[in-house]
């Protein structure tokens, strides 16, 4: 468990670190101290599921990114179903240029785009190096903290219900 990869960003409500670099796009090529440390801590590990919990200050509805093994339905829809009881789900057809349906964006779509840009997020890095299945959960900072925590706990509960041994 990596509790907070970007403490500066968390404290200052920004996705960039102190140097102004987006850590969650620095897992390939131009790395940061934070992404280097995360890769070092995760090196050689293998997981059934990678879960990355985020907050989004730009959008009012919950959404997630999911990469699942070929032919498997994933758990994103179940997660979104649980979170609908907590707050609104992002409902537009696209988010930041990525197609989104039912609050779920395909991590494979991001992977193709990031490869063109020479960047990689923790999720796309994790799907390539660490796990066959991955989720990045995005709770809106516009929600009350209590609701954001409840939503992220729901993500973990659903995840554990599918992967607990």
PLM features per residue range, with description:
Residues 1-165:
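Structured catalytic-domain cores with a bias toward divalent-metal coordination
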